[in-house]
């Protein structure tokens, strides 16, 4: 049976706590393979995609997209991921191969990421809806959005850089809730949503919405041709007869004949 990435939204009316659960394993697997990621970058890409899928649960406009850009002082360099309102995921890490760390199963954030700055942007074509900067996703939720919420992420890759799983949970205590959001911590991510919620202490939570997610990029051969066509005539004349253009968001490469741009 073909596996499908999902986002599930649940709500416990008694405790006034909402939970969003995502599984982006298939999208992360395809993107990591497309970028030729090593095990470490595949791991962090998987967790970043889960974060974007969680935060994008609140996108409302038809063409809206939520992006997370992270810059860090560690060797990974950062990442850029995006999830659209209709569930399309794409993204990349700055470094794809980390020779010093790829041979080890350890994922030490302090060594691989160092200090971080995260920018979360919600936008539609031609307009930014909102933007926030923080040192972490939880910091963005608490600081920029003033919300009592926490994100929990889980990812696993093997030494062949295959993503084995990529999942996430966003827990939020609503303003009229008397609960502390830190009380609801998932211990396992490899179980059905209803079991995970019971494990977290929310057995009475009810499903609100389910949406499918997928890897999809807006790049195309036509966009590649248009990009070269935007160069001035002198610049195009200096190009070889064929040129390869790689999309940095998904790793797909297009071979363009430069005479197509004239």
Please identify what each model-predicted range represents.
Residues 1-207:
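Interaction interfaces in information-processing and related assembly proteins
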Residues 184-262:
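Cys/His-clustered metal-coordination modules, chiefly Zn-binding fingers
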């Amino acid at each position: 049976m073909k596996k499908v990435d999902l986002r599930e939204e649940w709500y416990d009316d008694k405790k006034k706590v909402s939970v969003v659960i995502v599984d982006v394993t298939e999208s992360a697997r395809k993107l990591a393979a497309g970028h030729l990621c090593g095990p470490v970058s595949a791991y962090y890409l998987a967790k970043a995609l889960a974060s974007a899928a969680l935060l994008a649960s609140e996108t409302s406009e038809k063409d809206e997209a939520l992006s997370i850009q992270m810059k860090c002082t560690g060797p990974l360099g950062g990442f850029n991921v995006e999830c659209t309102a209709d569930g399309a995921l794409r993204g990349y890490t700055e470094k794809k191969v980390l020779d010093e760390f790829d041979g080890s199963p350890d994922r030490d954030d302090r060594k691989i990421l160092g200090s971080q700055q995260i920018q979360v942007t919600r936008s539609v074509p031609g307009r930014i809806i909102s933007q926030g900067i923080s040192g972490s996703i939880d910091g963005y939720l608490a600081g920029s959005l003033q919300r009592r919420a926490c994100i929990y992420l889980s990812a696993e890759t093997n030494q062949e850089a295959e993503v084995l799983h990529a999942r996430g949970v966003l827990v939020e205590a609503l303003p009229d809730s008397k609960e502390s959001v830190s009380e609801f911590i998932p211990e396992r991510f490899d179980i059905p949503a209803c079991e995970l919620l019971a494990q977290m202490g929310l057995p009475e939570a009810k499903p609100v919405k389910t949406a499918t997610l997928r890897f999809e990029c807006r790049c195309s051969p036509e966009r590649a041709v248009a990009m070269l066509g935007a160069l001035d005539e002198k610049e195009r004349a200096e190009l070889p007869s064929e040129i390869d253009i790689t999309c940095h968001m998904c790793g797909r490469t297009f071979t363009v004949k430069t005479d197509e741009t004239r």
